[in-house]
């Protein structure tokens, strides 16, 4: 069965890559391309918007216009937009792949509650490499984390509006959980001035915003005499798009529930 797939955020940074990834995967059919209401791209052909030839699929400004044509929606928008799509998808029986970042704790709880009645893949990073790195971080934290100083450094392009990145926060969550800590209690976001001696139980975050960096993350476990660094660098957003499409295909074989890319890739356990 070919999966009817929609893209929300088709005019954004991920939009063109998602269009190309859908068109390249024989398991899916791109049946909807959604931008914000009033966007100048509404009415344009989704293929042409992605820098390809026309595919006969006009961009629409509202999910309700195409909800009967979609089995699974891939959403890379903004938190408030994703939450609106969440309600529409639940009502229409559409599965949802969420790549949006920048959610508050309360918004994340809304997503988790909605997943009790629908299938959702929610991951701040759809890259296979990043999710393999998360697995390695869990192992490293259990082996050396208790005695190491842990720092997370991330870099993205100048246009990214949330910091730290969702991926950096997820990395911090994985490390903290492996150590039996709560990230909210031990995270330090940047340092300035006279900060005093480092608290050994903290996890530090540093953020860089510059140029056109697609995404780079390094987690450092620094002990006396040695340190371990686990790094992932993305050179193209296509890796995220391919991962999102892979998640959409996987999700169609699942029931209700909240999943992440670790589930999709079989990395849990």
Swiss-Prot record:
Q: Which residues form the active site?
A: 156, 160
Q: Where in the cell is it found?
A: Cytoplasm
Task: Write down the Gene3D superfamilies for this protein, in alphabetical order.
Answer: Dihydrodipicolinate Reductase, domain 2 (3.30.360.10), NAD(P)-binding Rossmann-like Domain (3.40.50.720)
Residues engaged in binding (S)-2,3,4,5-tetrahydrodipicolinate: 157, 166-167
Residues at which NADP(+) binds: 36
Q: Where is NAD(+) bound in this sequence? A: 9-14, 99-101, 123-126
Q: What catalytic activity is recorded?
A: (S)-2,3,4,5-tetrahydrodipicolinate + NAD(+) + H2O = (2S,4S)-4-hydroxy-2,3,4,5-tetrahydrodipicolinate + NADH + H(+); (S)-2,3,4,5-tetrahydrodipicolinate + NADP(+) + H2O = (2S,4S)-4-hydroxy-2,3,4,5-tetrahydrodipicolinate + NADPH + H(+)
Q: Which UniProt keywords apply?
A: Amino-acid biosynthesis, Cytoplasm, Diaminopimelate biosynthesis, Lysine biosynthesis, NAD, NADP, Oxidoreductase
The kind of enzyme this is, by top-level EC class, is: oxidoreductase
Q: What does this protein do?
A: Catalyzes the conversion of 4-hydroxy-tetrahydrodipicolinate (HTPA) to tetrahydrodipicolinate.
Q: Which family does it belong to?
A: Belongs to the DapB family.
What is the official name of this protein in its record?
4-hydroxy-tetrahydrodipicolinate reductase
Its organism's taxonomic lineage begins at: Bacteria, Pseudomonadati, Pseudomonadota, Gammaproteobacteria, Methylococcales
């Amino acid at each position: 069965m070919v999966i009817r797939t929609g893209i929300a955020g088709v005019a954004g940074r991920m939009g063109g890559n998602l269009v190309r990834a859908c068109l390249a995967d024989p398991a899916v059919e791109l049946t909807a391309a959604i931008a914000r209401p009033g966007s100048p791209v509404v009415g344009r052909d989704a293929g042409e918007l992605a820098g390809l030839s026309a595919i006969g699929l006009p961009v629409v400004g509202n999910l309700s216009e195409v909800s009967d044509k979609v089995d699974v929606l891939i959403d890379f928008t903004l938190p408030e937009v994703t939450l609106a799509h969440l309600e529409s998808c639940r009502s229409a029986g559409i599965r949802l792949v969420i790549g949006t970042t920048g959610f508050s704790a309360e918004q994340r709880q809304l997503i988790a509650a909605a997943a009790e009645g629908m299938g959702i893949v929610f991951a701040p990073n759809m890259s296979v490499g990043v999710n393999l790195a998360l697995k390695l971080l869990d192992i490293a934290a259990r082996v050396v984390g208790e005695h190491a100083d842990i720092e997370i450094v991330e870099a993205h392009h100048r246009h990214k509006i949330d910091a730290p990145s969702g991926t950096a926060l997820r990395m911090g969550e994985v490390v903290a959980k492996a150590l039996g800590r709560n990230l909210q209690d031990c995270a330090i976001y940047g340092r300035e001035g006279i900060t005093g001696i480092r608290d050994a139980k903290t996890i530090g975050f540093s953020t860089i915003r510059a140029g056109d960096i697609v995404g780079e993350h390094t987690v450092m476990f620094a002990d006396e005499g040695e340190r371990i660094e686990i790094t992932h660098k993305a050179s193209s957003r296509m890796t995220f798009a391919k991962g999102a499409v892979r998640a959409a295909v996987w999700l169609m074989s699942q029931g209700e529930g909240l999943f992440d890319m670790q589930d999709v890739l079989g990395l849990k356990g």
